[in-house]
């Protein structure tokens, strides 16, 4: 029986394989290189699609992409490419592949291997292996990853603003306390001024009801000027010296000169400033020796009353108002009011100006 070979096997001559040489087989070049992950490929196609530029597109530098409308991105594009609509999950996936957020105020992400027109570089992007951790830690880590994309910067900015506001509040409180203390001091001064004004008006009201006293007070001005001119020409003599003869040939003792020595002041100023005046001098001229004796007796009785450095305190005004310094119901209103007012204000200076014996 003859057998013919229908399909002969062609034996090719060539280099011996590794099996013949006893070496293990190796894969062909390029078979081991896998493509980029589907997540990166879909993301690249979604960003590179010009029809979705209103929602997501490349940045001006072409090395990052920007999600312009996160709401439409999650509701329209994510279900079309990834079968879900969770934008936070998409951000976490980007974080696992090493994407970083460029601008904290925008949803802009970048990676060294994610460039426009260079899709072959996606193979260089590797997924980071998550560390072994419990599920609770993994969920917490996902929130922290999302926080890296802008929330930490916002939190730091809010903290700085809070510190600035607290410092401003403390400063305003200090200014408020200072202003409050100043207002209290001003109120106290105002109350004191009002009290002095009330005392002054009450005193003036009583004085104006006694016209005789006012007339006598102003009638002394001419007499005062003459006495001041006379006293200015005189010189004080010591006690041990003898009496000096004046131009009329009469002698005058130091006691007589001391009775007319006084401080030159206006009658009205003396009334309100408490400066001792010479009402007793006018009384001597008007009433003679009897008035001089009355002045001497009244000065001896009230010798302890002294003016308080030319100032009228509140006690003086109260004593004057309560004790009736100017009483129109007395027997002789003009003389009595003038004497009592002189005693209160320390106008009688005959006893204080006498030379020591």
Swiss-Prot record:
Disordered: annotated segments: 231-357
The UniProt record lists the keyword Transferase: no
InterPro entries: HSF_DNA-bd (IPR000232), WH-like_DNA-bd_sf (IPR036388), WH_DNA-bd_sf (IPR036390)
Residue ranges, compositional bias (Polar residues): 249-259, 348-357
Induction notes from the record: By heat stress.
Protein family (similarity comment): Belongs to the HSF family. Class A subfamily.
UniProt protein name: Heat stress transcription factor A-2e
Species this protein is from: Oryza sativa subsp. japonica
Source organism phylogeny: Eukaryota, Viridiplantae, Streptophyta, Embryophyta, Tracheophyta
């Amino acid at each position: 029986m003859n057998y013919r070979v229908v399909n002969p096997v062609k034996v090719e001559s060539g280099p011996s394989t590794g099996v013949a040489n006893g070496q293990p087989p190796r894969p062909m070049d390029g078979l081991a290189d896998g493509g980029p992950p589907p997540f990166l490929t879909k993301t690249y196609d979604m960003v590179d699609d010009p029809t979705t530029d209103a929602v997501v597109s490349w940045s001006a530098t072409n090395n990052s992409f920007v999600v312009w409308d996160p709401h439409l991105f999650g509701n329209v594009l994510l279900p079309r490419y990834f079968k879900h609509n969770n934008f936070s999950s998409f951000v976490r996936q980007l974080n696992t592949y090493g994407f970083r957020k460029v601008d904290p105020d925008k949803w802009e992400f970048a990676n060294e291997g994610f460039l426009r027109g260079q899709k072959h570089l996606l193979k260089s992007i590797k997924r980071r292996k998550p560390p072994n951790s419990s599920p609770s830690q993994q969920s917490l880590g996902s929130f922290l990853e999302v926080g890296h994309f802008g929330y930490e910067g916002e939190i730091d900015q809010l903290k700085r603003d809070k510190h600035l506001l607290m410092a401003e509040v403390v400063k305003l409180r200090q200014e408020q306390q200072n202003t409050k203390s100043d207002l209290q001091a001003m109120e106290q001064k105002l109350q004191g001024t009002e009290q002095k004004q009330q005392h002054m008006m009450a005193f003036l009201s009583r004085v104006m009801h006694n016209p005789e006293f006012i007339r006598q007070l102003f009638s002394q001005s001419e007499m005062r000027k003459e006495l001041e001119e006379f006293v200015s020409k005189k010189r004080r003599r010591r006690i041990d010296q003898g009496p000096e003869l004046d131009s009329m040939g009469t002698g005058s003792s130091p006691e007589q000169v001391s009775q007319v020595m006084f401080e030159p002041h206006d009658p009205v100023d003396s009334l309100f400033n408490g400066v001792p005046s010479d009402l007793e001098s006018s009384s001597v001229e008007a009433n003679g020796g009897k008035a001089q004796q009355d002045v001497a007796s009244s000065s001896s009785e009230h010798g302890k009353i002294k003016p308080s450095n030319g100032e009228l305190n509140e006690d003086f005004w109260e004593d004057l108002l309560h004790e009736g310094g100017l009483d129109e119901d007395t027997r002789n209103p003009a003389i009595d009011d003038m004497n009592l007012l002189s005693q209160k204000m320390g106008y009688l200076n005959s006893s204080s100006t006498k030379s020591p014996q």
